[in-house]
UniProtKB/Swiss-Prot annotation:
Keywords: Acetylation, Carbohydrate metabolism, Disease variant, Glucose metabolism, Metal-binding, Mitochondrion, Oxidoreductase, Phosphoprotein, Potassium, Pyruvate, Thiamine pyrophosphate, Transit peptide, Tricarboxylic acid cycle
Protein name from the UniProt record: Pyruvate dehydrogenase E1 component subunit beta, mitochondrial
Enzyme Commission number(s) of this protein: 1.2.4.1
Boundaries of the annotated transit peptide in chain numbering: 1-30
Gene Ontology cellular-component annotations: mitochondrial matrix; mitochondrion; nucleoplasm; nucleus; pyruvate dehydrogenase complex
Site (Important for interaction with DLAT): residue numbering on this chain: 319
Sequence positions that bind thiamine diphosphate: 89
Length: 359
């Protein structure tokens, strides 16, 4: 009775507020998309947008791709635009380059970039050099794509990083996506580019889901080639990486943050042309640099970054020598314990960061 009389004595507006039914709601979960599906979506949208785009490679059509990246595209676009080829990288890469010279926009899939060695003449001599050799008269709008870098248990001839190989060649653009957003935005930009673009995907990342922001779901979503992304802001040290090791760098940064060390993690996205402006600006802020890559140490991507820092304005801002974290200088072993020790792990990145900061 006391509670009821208390309500009676209160103003009507206040009583109605107390009696109003309250609803609790949870925000919808962010859309999760795997890297595989993001690439598939990007190719699908570009095939739909431009009838000059087509995909060719081993098992890309009826089998939906060795890694199911082209799943559903053959059923949607048919034999003329999703083309299964014989096991001859030199042959179908040459056909693709010729088609690009004739005005089409081929996507040439290598089952693994290790097999692109069979077609290196077509990629370098035919695709990369033609625009220059023709005095700018003959563009070659072609995409070479497929899994790159270390895989699991496939040994030396199927496990290595080609970022430095192709990044060395003028006339090529080279991109190396990490997450689903990267994968879709970069594959679409690569297909629309009038130059040959090498898209270095990662086999171990295909099935990994990432949050897919609303802007990435648009058919107009593009990531500009030649622009890096700061994945984590920091003030103590700059950590630069590409492809799968970006995730390792973020894990290392999370561990070190608990110890008071704030790492700025840069996802390169593009190997060539390299976004040195973003890297230099970060180094000028943090005064320290660590590069991380899955490739071999000699003449690698990290070595190129360090050389450019030495030659540019950021060098005078360094408080300690730059440090590289790379794969081991050996062909990829088969045994799992040796394989794990041949590519950078989170502990290796943490060690390098602490070494650079002298902590």
């Amino acid at each position: 009775m006391a509670a009821v009389s208390g309500l009676v004595r209160r103003p009507l507006r206040e009583v109605s507020g107390l009696l109003k039914r309250r609803f609790h709601w949870t925000a919808p979960a962010a859309l999760q998309v795997t890297v595989r599906d993001a690439i598939n979506q990007g190719m699908d949208e570009e095939l739909e947008r431009d009838e000059k785009v087509f995909l060719l490679g081993e098992e890309v059509a009826q089998y939906d791709g060795a890694y199911k990246v082209s799943r559903g595209l053959w059923k949607k676009y048919g034999d003329k635009r999703i083309i299964d080829t014989p096991i001859s990288e030199m042959g179908f890469a040459g056909i693709a380059v010729g088609a690009a010279m004739a005005g089409l926009r081929p996507i040439c899939e290598f089952m693994t970039f290790n097999f692109s060695m069979q077609a290196i003449d077509q990629v370098i001599n035919s695709a990369a050099k033609t625009y220059y050799m023709s005095g700018g008269l003959q563009p070659v709008p072609i995409v070479f794509r497929g899994p790159n870098g270390a895989s699991a248990g496939v040994a030396a001839q199927h496990s290595q990083c080609f970022a430095a190989w192709y990044g060395h060649c003028p006339g090529l653009k080279v991109v190396s996506p990490w997450n689903s957003e990267d994968a879709k935005g970069l594959i679409k930009s690569a297909i629309r580019d009038n130059n040959p673009v090498v898209v270095l995907e990662n086999e171990l990342m295909y099935g990994v889901p990432f949050e897919f922001p609303p802007e990435a779901q648009s058919k107009d979503f593009l990531i500009p080639i030649g622009k890096a992304k700061i994945e984590r802001q920091g003030t103590h040290i700059t950590v630069v990486s590409h492809s799968r090791p970006v995730g390792h760098c973020l894990e290392a940064a999370a561990v070190l943050s608990k110890e008071g060390v704030e790492c700025e993690v840069i996802n390169m996205r593009t190997i060539r042309p390299m976004d040195m402006e973003t890297i230099e600006a970060s180094v000028m802020k943090t005064n320290h640099l660590v590069t991380v890559e899955g490739g071999w140490p000699q003449f690698g991507v990290g070595a190129e970054i360090c050389a450019r820092i030495m030659e540019g304005p950021a060098f005078n801002f360094l408080d300690a020598p730059a440090v590289r974290v790379t794969g081991a200088d050996v062909p990829m072993p088969y045994a799992k314990i040796l394989e794990d020790n041949s590519i950078p792990q989170v502990k290796d990145i943490i060690f390098a960061i602490k070494k650079t900061l002298n902590i």
